[in-house]
Amino acid sequence: MKTKLPTEWQELSDQLGFQEFTPIQTQLFEPLLAGENLLGVSPTGTGKTLAYLLPSLLRLQKKKAQQLLILAPNTELAGQIFDVCKTWAETIGLTPQLFLSGSSQKRQIERLKKGPEILIGTPGRIFELIKLKKIKMMNVETIILDEFDQLLDDSQIHFVEKITHYAPRDHQLVYMSATTKFDQEKIAPNTHTIDLSDQKLDNIQHFYMQVDQRHRVDMLRKLAHVEDFRGLVFFNSLSDLGSAEEKLQYRDILAVSLASDVNVKFRKVILEKFKDKQLTLLLATDLLARGIDIDSLECVVNFDVPRDSETYTHRAGRTGRMGKEGYVITLVTHPEELKKLKKFASVREIILKNQELYIK
């Protein structure tokens, strides 16, 4: 990397223990700093947030009276981006503000009056503020679409298209994604692509446990009794999630689900308790777990074999973040599931190990 980081960032890096750039951070830095339109693809847990934030903040610092807009598919991810951005931006004199659906619009309008250089939010709320003429897109030089594949899945792309329509014709547009499950030529033509989706996460170990379908909750209970164990458990269905939560709590296991009817505020409380190790198991579906970012999470458990290899990779990336050690355990109930799991492992070049743990 040619560009030298500001002294303030070098000091902050030492404080945070940020020692070296990951591959995606290294490869995105100069193109983003130069203002290129770019698609960056890298698995979950490889440092994509800082990969686009650091060069974009430096570029913004040099361009007075301009703004940076970051769109995320959900409130949790937007909040996490804001927290990271605030840490790095304020040391070089830049101010971020957060704009979420479900939060007080009046307060958000008051924040805009303070003239923040960085706007972070969900597409729906950002578009509402544009229509109210509270956000003036003529000042936005760079738009970053984080977890772009999820923005497509959530059908928020129509908001994104309307937002970009209001931006200056020569604005910089950056797509960040964990997968490439979309037609790039159709959606992001003539865009510089840096695709590290095949990057191996060698710091994550992968196991499977063969268990009778009726004993899967018992297996979770047994794992929860392992000393210092803490795991994020993924379910393919809400009905299995609800049933498992009820059975685990009945047996005094500290397990809580991110149910769809949990409001944003309480959801944040649950996540904080899990991060603080006050909960042993956090139960979720892929949809409910979007935006979860827990740096020190050591284990992901698949209650069911995921539907496809990309889902498996996305779940696995919740652990072993930024080079830390992690492991994934998948519960397998019959031979066809094991065959499917081994196919995922072959596609992703993962070493899959059988972990025997018998229910007593």
Predicted regions located by residue number:
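Conserved helicase RecA-like core
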Residues: 1-360
